[in-house]
A protein has these predicted regions:
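N-terminal transmembrane-helix/juxtamembrane module of multi-pass inner/ER membrane proteins
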Residues: 2-22, 27-76, 82-86, 99-130
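Membrane-embedded catalytic cores of phosphoryl/pyrophosphoryl-handling enzymes
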Residues: 7, 115-222
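Solvent-exposed loop/turn segments connecting transmembrane beta-strands
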Residues: 53-60, 78, 177-178, 210-215
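Alpha-helical transmembrane segments of integral membrane proteins
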Residues: 59-62, 84-87, 91, 157-160, ...
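Hydrophobic alpha-helical transmembrane segments of multipass integral membrane proteins
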Residues: 62, 66-69, 98, 141-144, ...
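Sec/Tat-exported extracytoplasmic proteins
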Residues: 63, 70-74, 93, 97, ...
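Membrane-interface alpha-helices
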Residues: 80, 88-89, 175
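Hydrophobic, lipid-facing residues on alpha-helical transmembrane segments of integral membrane proteins
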Residues: 85, 89-105, 143-144, 185, ...
Length: 223
């Protein structure tokens, strides 16, 4: 039998919540519009060395995913920490799916494939294989760390340091000419906005609800 003794977080009024959701959805829509690039896109000198090296970017991306998945399975969903882990899984999956759909829809050419310097950031809807907008990795990292910032930031301000991970990834992706500046900004907005919506939902976490009892209570109770 599942223990539902975990106290739910305080939530605002229903109407205020609906207004906030609409505001976030509008923000995400604006972030997804090609017209919002506002002239900030430009090709930067290629840099795949030091902390910006591609292998280090992959360590951050896969490390964040592994910690979220491992923490969710280990902790289960009966504690505040466990529920936060599972919300990060929800937001990571949801934001990742939306990002992939947007990539295929907008089919934007990556900076490294857009021609000689300074490149052409205006190559949208170029068909299969062009998936620059938005940055999937920045979307993924921001969607996974944001639930922890939202849940614990007020009590433990140091948690805000987690935001350095998507910021690092955004800079690194631009430096290796894999994304334009608006690609990573849109990815950050998409990941953060998705996590916020899931955090605010009284029915989250969602994926946890279809998990078997052994996963719900956490693997730690099996040892």
């Amino acid at each position: 039998m599942r223990d539902h003794s975990y106290a739910p977080r305080a939530r605002g009024g229903r109407h205020a919540g609906h207004r906030a959701r609409r505001a976030v959805l509008l923000f995400l829509l604006l972030a997804a519009m090609p017209a919002c690039r506002a002239g900030i896109d430009h090709l930067v000198p290629y840099d795949d060395s030091g902390i910006w090296k591609r292998s280090n970017q992959e360590i951050v991306e896969y490390g964040v995913i592994a910690i979220a998945a491992g923490g969710a399975l280990w902790e289960g969903g009966e504690s505040r920490l466990g529920k936060t882990f599972w919300r990060s899984i929800d937001s990571g999956v949801a934001a990742g799916l939306v990002a992939q759909l947007m990539k295929v829809t907008f089919s934007r050419v990556r900076p490294r494939d857009s021609g000689p310097a300074p490149g052409d950031p205006n190559l949208w809807f170029q068909g299969h294989g062009n998936e620059s907008f938005p940055s999937g990795e920045v979307t993924e990292v921001s969607s996974i760390v944001t639930p922890f910032v939202l849940e614990y930031g007020h009590d433990h301000p140091g948690v805000y340091a987690l935001e350095l991970l998507p910021i690092y990834d955004a800079i690194a992706r631009v430096k290796v000419q894999a994304h334009w500046q608006t690609d990573v900004l849109a990815g950050f907005a998409l990941g953060t906005g998705t996590a916020w919506l899931i955090h605010r939902s009284p029915n989250s976490p969602f994926i946890l609800q279809v998990m078997p009892h052994g996963i719900y209570v956490g693997l730690k109770k099996s040892f």
